[in-house]
Amino acid sequence: MSTTFIIAFVCYALGALISIAFGVNYLLRSEFMPYHREAVGVDWQELDPRMRALLTGLMRVAAGGMLAEGISMLIMLQIPFRAGEIWAQYAVPLIGLVGALPTLYATILIRRRTGAHTPVLAGAAGIVLVVAGFILTKI
């Protein structure tokens, strides 16, 4: 692999690891994130048990998406991308952006509507890394 492909590989891997880190965090939490509390203005224990069950389920779904995105990217990087498969140069960023763009949109929307300190920068960083990786494969 050329130097630019190695840097692209690292950018993609870092983007994938951001997604995996958030996915693991959402999967293992027993209550919502501090920025979720900010958004709804209510502590976890004050919520109706059925609402807690619903929110926990939604967090698990989000975790699954983030984990699927990150793990898929890492597998694609390790096998077809490293082997120089042209289609992988498009599949890796596609997987990353399909997962990251809606997530970033949601964090921005929640921040604007509620004032909660959602992780906009982390989401944006993941997207920047994926886009940078794609650009580097085309140089």
Predicted ranges, named:
Residues Y35-H36, E85-P93:
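Membrane-interfacial loop-to-transmembrane alpha-helix junctions, especially the N-terminal start
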